[in-house]
């Protein structure tokens, strides 16, 4: 319900968000966005089916809803588990609600400022001198939205690990002893969830997941947990 409500609020301004995201990573026409559709330089979005723009708007609205809904989901899970939690476990879970939102925003920012620029620079240089890329709205925007949503979820890894350890579900040693299994699992998830045949996006996703996993274990070891 929360995700749907936020999506409805964002949908009317989705076109502005689409243009902002698109030209954050791809070159705009020399004469500005209004030059799209004419013979101009720049990576204007290409629409190859009548529903492409509508679906792009829905994806933007859904991403906003997902980010806001993450802490709500954590809180709803807390309400479900609350009768069986000890007082200290309840404190941990309540603290996780705002932390989840912060981590989701950090994940989106990480994708926006670091991951997506690297991916699109790689794409632009990949075929330079061989072919001119026509960036389709659907496929290109799917990648942008997927990376932002995926990194919002990926950055929950430290939170989930810490909650599991603090609540006695697992231990740092158990996770550390099986790190290679987690690494391979992260790699498999990255290649399944990242629609990039060049392999650049899955590689960056997998490296980020492994790094977050190891940094969390390092922090727990440093704090003596």
Show where each model-derived region lies:
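Membrane topogenic/interface segments and analogous intrinsically disordered interaction regions
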Residues: 1-225
